[in-house]
From Swiss-Prot:
Region entry Framework-3, spans: 84-121
Gene label: IGHV4-34
GO biological process, one term: immune response
SUPFAM superfamilies per record: Immunoglobulin
Protein name: Immunoglobulin heavy variable 4-34
Chain spans, region Complementarity-determining-1: 52-59
Length: 123
């Protein structure tokens, strides 16, 4: 086993969250939370809560930005649970909704270093 593969076995990486996790979109505020440090092959879980506006009538999205790269759309969900996913991530992504709490969640399975990014929830 070469040194690179040996080091990859023990690789930890950061899935960065927004430094200021609550921000305002019009009168709607979104607050997200979740694990920021994972080992390869683990599952990333993030949740976003919507405050101060209507939850129904919109699609709620997850977007990410890898270091030094542009934004990448992950997927979206509406209040009734209808989803759309980025085809390149679809096999590993699940987005769910909890209308009783005005929250929606992202799960990304089998993460690798290529999934290192700033993850955003958005309307």
């Amino acid at each position: 086993m070469d040194l690179l593969h040996k080091n990859m076995k023990h690789l930890w990486f950061f899935l960065l969250l927004v430094a200021a996790p609550r921000w305002v979109l019009s009168q709607v505020q979104l607050q997200q939370w979740g694990a920021g440090l994972l080992k390869p092959s683990e599952t990333l879980s993030l949740t976003c809560a919507v405050y101060g506006g209507s939850f129904s009538g919109y699609y709620w999205s997850w977007i990410r930005q890898p270091p030094g790269k542009g934004l990448e759309w992950i997927g979206e969900i509406n209040h009734s649970g209808s989803t759309n996913y980025n085809p390149s991530l679809k096999s590993r992504v699940t987005i769910s909704v909890d209308t009783s709490k005005n929250q929606f969640s992202l799960k990304l399975s089998s993460v690798t270093a290529a999934d290192t990014a700033v993850y955003y929830c958005a309307r």
